[in-house]
Regions:
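Positively charged n-region of N-terminal signal peptides that target proteins for export
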Residues: 1-4
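Sec-dependent N-terminal signal peptides
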Residues: 6-10
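Acidic, Ser/Thr/Pro
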Residues: 18-151
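C-terminal motif of bacterial Sec signal peptides marking the signal peptidase cleavage site
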Residues: 14-16
Length: 151
């Protein structure tokens, strides 16, 4: 009986998390930044007018001193360029499951956080081409850096 209740509790917690943060509809993963070589990752989604989407990040990094970490995203709708935008991966609201440890000038930081949100203005095939940039920091180690789209 205890196992059944535990299983039910875990299931409800996971369902509740989706209700709070939204359903994942796309994910773009990075293992390194585009400071030397341009590394472009993309995802394409069929979106409808009025849908609300949000941009989240899942980060697990290690670095020394100061760091800036920015997603640069180019948007295409039905293969036509629409422009682009930038999002700071280190400034999220809300931030969830955060673990940040600093010792001296070395930091390890892991979290999930929301960076931005939109309401879709027209039906179409939306392509998000993303690049991850950082400030010059040769100590940066990316264990995980993912741009996650949810609705």
């Amino acid at each position: 009986m205890k196992k059944l209740l535990l299983g039910l509790s875990i299931t409800l917690a996971l369902i509740g998390c989706d209700a709070l943060t939204g359903e994942e509809i796309g994910r773009i993963s990075f293992k390194q930044t585009s400071d030397v070589e341009q590394i472009i990752r993309e995802t394409t989604l069929d979106l409808k007018k009025g849908e609300k989407i949000s941009f989240w990040t899942e980060i697990d990094i290690e670095y020394e001193n100061e760091l800036a970490l920015i997603y640069t995203v180019e948007l295409l709708i039905d293969s036509k360029e629409q422009g682009g935008f930038k999002m700071n991966a280190l400034e999220t609201n809300p931030t969830m499951m955060e673990i940040k440890k600093s010792l001296g000038n070395k930091t390890t930081w892991r979290y999930t956080g929301k960076m931005n949100h939109w309401t879709i203005k027209e039906d179409g095939n939306y392509t998000f081409k993303a690049v991850l940039h950082s400030s010059e920091n040769h100590t940066l180690k990316i264990n995980k850096a993912e741009l996650v789209l949810k609705k």
